[in-house]
């Protein structure tokens, strides 16, 4: 079986930026992650064994001088000490537990220092997705010529409509070749003539390097959720924004606000943070309703929302992005992160619906116990975590069922 992940930076930028801030602010924090397959997929016999071998192979994946040089050029906000850390970073199989039950369902857990395990999630999700297509024989049905042409058509529509967008598709891509093909098609289309819109780049750092594009991304829910587990959800957004400011000093200024819902975020989003952060990312809820909440919040602070960026990344496709662009452009500087719609859009192939969520955290290895955490989505009924933990967090935040 071929090795699926061969490059250290074949990963989303926000895993690296969060890793940097974790070391800077919570260097001794310990965490647990858990894999969730929302489709309850039955995996082929022996899948867990092969996935285990793929994870063990990560121990030989080390960052290269070329990757470091690229990040120094394109990610100038990263402090130089972080590149020294990455040079010495080594994956360990000891952080990961993989099993497959009698019904064929897959179970994956990570546990360890937050600064270590944070770089596993996206790589392991990409492994699971590609490995599933390999072991079920579907990989042979991936038509990359068709994907390239289809992606060019999508890009033409987005660019003509004035959309500013990026590829966000690493975690659930059909294969590395699929994402590489998509980014090549996006770049070729963008460079073919002048457009009303703009291709910003890709979340995948390695693919950004090979295509000489900007790597994009800031943070994921786990950053706020882990802090919520350690300190409680009421002030988690405040602590997260403060930690981000401490590390990046205003750079990487798009904040993902929906880890514990809009209401508590809004209470934490004071005028200094609203001025510091370039904008916000909408990743759940009704896009129009969420945008109107953001606009109203900025106005209440005396800030013109038209000067602020709003990144939409909530299960977008070409049609929904263009629709949002039409109404959002009058209220903000809209941009779009498009994932599976780009990197896993093949005839007769069902994209996987898989996530790995941070489920518990503790501030130091000295503590004898972890504190559970969860995510409270703006989509009703889509909270993630143990039911009793969700109830406890909702009670703490005075949220209604």
Where are these regions (language model features)?
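Ordered alpha/beta subdomains of enzyme catalytic regions
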Residues: 1-236, 245, 357-401
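Glycine-rich phosphate/ribose-binding loops and adjacent secondary-structure elements
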Residues: 2, 211-401
